[in-house]
């Protein structure tokens, strides 16, 4: 098997378990280590590219296409292509190329998208398909749709809208979500009604990566830190982009976000140079406005969200009181808004 970065051969595995590295500087960050092995490539990198079986509608996607629930098999079938970077894999004699098959330039299979978002059954082809759904991370129901002005993520997530509005007030860089008014083009009225009847809506956000700039989640950044013998990956993250790191502490407290984890924050990187840049915009706030009053920070060890936010606010002095001047955001419940205002006053 050959690991490619666009049209450049990066690494090749052999049947005897050996590997040949062609472009060391282009290795994925989690593979940048001494004594890289065959097992590192297959089991620590390739096997974690595909979607999680625990993701909503994941089993429907795989079952409808007749794809086994085996991560390496899934990765081989979809060439490990995703919308986070420009890496992909192919067999030595396989007739395919980046220009022919990459997800950024070509239309996507709409049936995969419908199954991914709603769970609807379709006969999906595993022999000829073009979809990022087999490598989309996270657990919520979601899908990618290519439109005239770019690629959009559609997901079930009422809370993304008020979270976006609040972060706009704070001036914190984040992925902007909007109500998916275009939904009628992809789903029937009955399916939209079923989602709205349970108090949810479908929102969309524009893809933040492209063929020049990719992202790596903190989970992979932490592996890279360990391989570079950097003792504290959180301190290293803060050192590399202190402002964004502190903004995340404040955002998670104000939103009372219970779902900041190693897979939904991290860094941009330059695809051609394979060099880390600053943190990418904050995202995934569909578990915000948690009812629990005291949540522990997942990005500042041993601190509550309030304690971590106070440390950050002492550094940034963001205009948090401006939140008190805006009307209650649409789609936010009265009690959720009351708790937001209470947290602002405590900060």
Model regions and ranges:
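Catalytic-loop of the protein kinase fold
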Residues: 252-257, 262
């Amino acid at each position: 098997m050959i690991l490619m970065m666009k049209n450049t051969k990066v690494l090749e595995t052999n049947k005897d378990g050996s590997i040949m590295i062609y472009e060391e500087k282009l290795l994925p960050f989690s593979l940048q280590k001494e004594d890289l092995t065959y097992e590192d490539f297959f089991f620590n990198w390739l096997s974690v590219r595909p979607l999680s079986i625990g993701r909503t509608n994941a089993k429907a996607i795989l079952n409808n296409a007749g794809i086994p629930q085996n991560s390496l098999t899934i990765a081989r079938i979809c060439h490990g292509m995703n919308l986070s970077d420009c890496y992909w894999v192919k067999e030595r004699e396989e007739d395919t190329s980046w220009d022919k098959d990459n997800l950024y330039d070509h239309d996507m299979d709409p049936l995969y998208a419908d199954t991914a978002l709603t769970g609807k059954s379709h006969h999906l082809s595993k022999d000829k398909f073009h979809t990022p759904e087999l490598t989309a991370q996270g657990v919520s129901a979601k899908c990618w749709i290519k439109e005239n002005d770019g690629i959009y993520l559609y997901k079930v997530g009422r809370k993304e809208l008020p979270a976006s509005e609040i972060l706009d007030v704070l001036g914190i860089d984040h992925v902007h979500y909007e109500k998916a008014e275009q939904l009628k083009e992809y789903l029937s009225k009955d399916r939209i009604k079923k989602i709205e009847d349970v108090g949810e809506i479908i929102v969309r956000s524009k893809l933040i990566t492209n063929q020049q700039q990719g992202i790596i989640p903190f989970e992979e950044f932490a592996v890279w830190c360990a391989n570079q013998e950097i003792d504290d990956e959180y301190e290293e993250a803060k050192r590399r982009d202190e402002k964004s790191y502190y903004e995340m502490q404040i955002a998670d407290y104000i939103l009372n976000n219970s779902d900041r984890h190693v897979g939904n924050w991290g860094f941009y990187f330059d695809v051609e140079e394979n060099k880390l840049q600053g943190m990418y915009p904050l995202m995934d706030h569909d578990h915000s406005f948690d009812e629990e009053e005291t949540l522990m920070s997942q990005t500042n060890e041993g601190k509550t969200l309030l304690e971590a936010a106070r440390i950050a606010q002492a550094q940034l002095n963001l205009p948090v009181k401006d939140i008190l001047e805006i009307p209650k955001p649409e789609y936010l419940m009265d009690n959720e808004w009351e708790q937001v205002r209470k947290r602002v006053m405590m900060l």
